[in-house]
Amino acid sequence: MSLPIKLGYKASAEQFNPRELVEYTVAAERHGFDSVVVSDHFQPWRYTGGHAPWALAWLGAVGERTSRVQIGTSVLTPTFRYNPAIIAQAFATFGMLYPGRVFLGVGTGEALNEQAVGLKEWPEFKERFARLRESVELMRKLWTEERVNYEGEYYRTVDATVYDKPSEPIPVYVSAGGAVVARYAGRAGDGFICTSGKGAELYTETLLPAVQEGADKVGRDAGGIDKLIEIKLSYDPDPWLALNNTRFWSPLSLSAEQKHSLSDPKQMEEAADALPMEQIAKRWIVASDPDEVVEKIKFYTDLGLNHLVFHAPGHDQLRFLEVFERDLAPRLRSL
């Protein structure tokens, strides 16, 4: 089984204020995108010019202004500053308001968003992953059962009921940057999320084989798992803009350890601004030729990544949406 190509738009919540971002999302639906995803940050990647609107409030506004696109998080961490029962309630409400259009993308989190609101020490991966598994289990119980009594290592409910919930549970997409969580996505995720630009071997040797392994372990058809990849694409007919638009997002080019451990946007910005442009641009597909873009994206679709969500780094998002629809969408849908 293989799923059809879907084209999505990444609403850059760390770059734009919530009103701008809603309007860009409405425009994305108008320009033919199939989905819109948003990250859920308490703090942005950079202090200067950064934004961090609350994803849950924002999704409600977007749901009311759109009628067709799938909407969801990429990603939200339901484990520290949130109680997963509250996230279950929130997404059940979204599911009632926008049936069939909502998904919850989850990950193990970043210190940047948790320590600012009181988490004293950033836990090791083992605890973060255990919390994620437990939170997903609890949320699914709350979406399908009543009077849930849950006694986990980290979370507990007593006769808990989500009173307003859709007839079908909210799809949970699991974000992974390594084999351990990717195997979990294959076992338990309705969808899988990863990001582009991290070296071919990560996808061919680690992530996708791990998703397959996890699915095989529980007798699932991995081909039926919606495999979403956030593609970092700086496309513009003007080559100078295509390159220099990536500068705002230089923090994405920091090491995984830096991104997971730094807790201050000012520190993140200082570390990122010290990076050379060549290193910043390496995380992105930087191009002015649409055929070059399609050829590079074909690498991912050939691996079975079917849900292509495009993150454009420039400040002129309407320009990106227009040139994407004109130059890229028809070519990508034919892959």
From Swiss-Prot:
- Cite the EC number: 1.1.98.2
Q: Which Gene3D superfamilies match?
A: Luciferase-like domain
UniProt KW keywords: Carbohydrate metabolism, Oxidoreductase
Q: Name one GO molecular function term.
A: oxidoreductase activity, acting on paired donors, with incorporation or reduction of molecular oxygen
What domain of life does the UniProt record list for this protein's source? Bacteria
Q: Does the keyword Oxidoreductase apply?
A: yes
Enumerate the InterPro entries for this protein: F420-dep_G6P_DH, F420-G6PD/mer, F420_G6P_DH-rel, Luciferase-like_dom, Luciferase-like_sf
List, in alphabetical order, the GO biological process terms annotated in this UniProt record.
Answer: carbohydrate metabolic process
SUPFAM superfamilies named among the record's database cross-references: Bacterial luciferase-like
Residues in the active site? H41 (proton donor), E110 (proton acceptor)
Q: Which Pfam families match?
A: Bac_luciferase
Q: Where does substrate bind?
A: T195, K198, K259, R283
Binding residue positions for coenzyme F420-(gamma-Glu)n: D40, T77, T108, G109, N113, G177, G178, V180, V181
**Has the keyword Zinc been applied to this entry?**
no
Q: Which reaction does it catalyse?
A: oxidized coenzyme F420-(gamma-L-Glu)(n) + D-glucose 6-phosphate + H(+) = 6-phospho-D-glucono-1,5-lactone + reduced coenzyme F420-(gamma-L-Glu)(n)
Q: PANTHER family of this UniProt entry?
A: 5,10-METHYLENETETRAHYDROMETHANOPTERIN REDUCTASE (PTHR43244:SF1), PTHR43244
Q: How does it assemble?
A: Homodimer.
Sum up the protein's function in the record's words: Catalyzes the coenzyme F420-dependent oxidation of glucose 6-phosphate (G6P) to 6-phosphogluconolactone.
**Which family does the entry's similarity section mention?**
Belongs to the F420-dependent glucose-6-phosphate dehydrogenase family.
Name the record gives this protein: F420-dependent glucose-6-phosphate dehydrogenase
Q: Which organism is it from?
A: Segniliparus rotundus (strain ATCC BAA-972 / CDC 1076 / CIP 108378 / DSM 44985 / JCM 13578)
